Amino acid sequence: MFKMVSSPHTHSGKLTAHIMLWVILAMMPAFFTQIYYFGFGVVLQSALAIGTAIIAEFIAIKLRGKKPLNYLSDFSVALTALILAMAIPPYAPYWIIIIGTLCAVLLGKQVYGGLGQNPFNPAMIGYVILLISFPLQMTTWMPPINLLQEPPTFSDTFSLIFSGLTTDGFTLSQLTHNIDGITQATPLDSAKIFYKSHNQLSDFYELIKLPIFMGNGTDFAQGWWQINVAFLAGGIFLILKRIIHWQIPVAMLVTFFCLATATAFTGFTHLSAISQLVSGAMMFGAFFIATDPVTASITPRGKIIFGALVGLFVYLIRYHGNYPDGVAFAILLSNICVPLIDHYTRPRVSGYPTKGRK
């Protein structure tokens, strides 16, 4: 006896859980690179985020009258939590990541019905809520630990996150007292602050003398470009594994690079276009966030348009907005446009003539 089931009758064999695990695996080079340059904070933030996400998802699914284990086993909520944990400052207070994770899971995902129903990237919903609500905590970054006289140990990190003090009673700002105060911001923050009072091209050489930059005549920032390269390597791995498509990251990066390069010829002072590509969350966003299959465009041409739109928004925010990075806002703004993009880029159905032809 044959059993009738709905289409599709053949599929790639890639289960949701397998895809999520591949993405998590591809993030590991950047995860360990972040530990190397910024300490153990990301480990504790990830543990808090994943634990909070699992509990929140369990309760939400239970309240909807469904079996939580059937949904938790796809690892999607763990990936959301890990993305958020790697996006916030590693030494942010513990309540920051808990609030952000709850917002990501409940407001960014479950309120729409769960996995596959959300129109916006859940991790970016949580991140943007935190950035708007707690700007001080979300913009206070520890400089690379190799610049510190006494890098925080694991116990210091635990104490900083949960009490705001190290085991010896020092605050985060006191740990960096021997470094220029601007280094508690990211390189993009530092550049935006610097160029508000320095608008000459010659002032570029004053900027790159700051401790967070390499000190070899370039504007590549210590720790940040290495993390971005690690995300790039992980992203290429996902493309080769056919977990993600190349159109979105390539369109995003090329669009931003072209606009940033063109702007440089107008005399507008900022970090170089190459440095911008390996600063902030550029590679993270291009390969691991913008490519979310639920919230991104699904058509071949739509992916290119969507990626280019993200790149355009990142450029506008970084160069002309108040926020130094802009990747999270750019992705959410582009998510809004996805239904329209997909509507106008639908492939022609086989056997049907194109519009205007008989």
From Swiss-Prot:
Membrane topology: Multi-pass membrane protein
TM region positions: 19-39, 41-61, 79-99, 125-145, 220-240, 248-268, 271-291, 297-317, 321-341
Taxonomic source organism: Haemophilus influenzae (strain 86-028NP)
Lineage: Bacteria, Pseudomonadati, Pseudomonadota, Gammaproteobacteria, Pasteurellales
Pfam families, per database record: NQR2_RnfD_RnfE (PF03116)
Record-linked HAMAP family: RsxD_RnfD
Record note on quaternary structure: The complex is composed of six subunits: RnfA, RnfB, RnfC, RnfD, RnfE and RnfG.
Residues the record lists as FMN phosphoryl threonine modifications: 186
The entry's keywords: Cell inner membrane, Cell membrane, Electron transport, Flavoprotein, FMN, Membrane, Phosphoprotein, Translocase, Transmembrane, Transmembrane helix, Transport
Keyword Membrane annotated: yes
Entries under InterPro entries matching the protein: NqrB/RnfD, RnfD_bac
Any coiled-coil regions, as ranges: none
Domain of life (superkingdom): Bacteria
PANTHER family for the chain: ELECTRON TRANSPORT COMPLEX PROTEIN RNFD, ION-TRANSLOCATING OXIDOREDUCTASE COMPLEX SUBUNIT D
Cellular localisation: Cell inner membrane
Main subcellular location: membrane
Protein family: Belongs to the NqrB/RnfD family.
UniProt protein name: Ion-translocating oxidoreductase complex subunit D
Function: Part of a membrane-bound complex that couples electron transfer with translocation of ions across the membrane.
Assigned EC number: 7.-.-.-
Keyword hit for Kinase: no
GO BP term, pick one: electron transport chain
Cofactors (names): FMN
